[in-house]
Amino acid sequence: NSDEQFDDYGYMRF
């Protein structure tokens, strides 16, 4: 994903 979002664990997903 190109959007910066935090998953349920708190890691940034790009």
From Swiss-Prot:
Native organism taxonomy = Eukaryota, Metazoa, Ecdysozoa, Arthropoda, Hexapoda
- What's its job? Myotropic peptide.
Species name = Rhodnius prolixus (Triatomid bug)
**Record PTM Phenylalanine amide, positions in chain:** 14
Name the source's superkingdom: Eukaryota
List GO terms (cellular component aspect): extracellular region
User: Per the UniProt entry, what is one GO biological process?
Assistant: neuropeptide signaling pathway
Report the family membership. Belongs to the gastrin/cholecystokinin family.
The signal peptide annotation in the UniProt record is: none
Query: Which residues does the record list as Methionine sulfoxide (modified residue)?
Result: 12
Please state where this protein is localized: Secreted
Task: List keywords of the entry alphabetically.
Answer: Amidation, Neuropeptide, Oxidation, Secreted
Give a short account of its post-translational modification.
Occurs in two forms, Rhopr-SK-2 contains unmodified Met-12 and Ox-Rhopr-SK-2 has oxidation at Met-12. Does not contain sulfotyrosine.
User: What is the name of the protein in this document?
Assistant: Sulfakinin-2
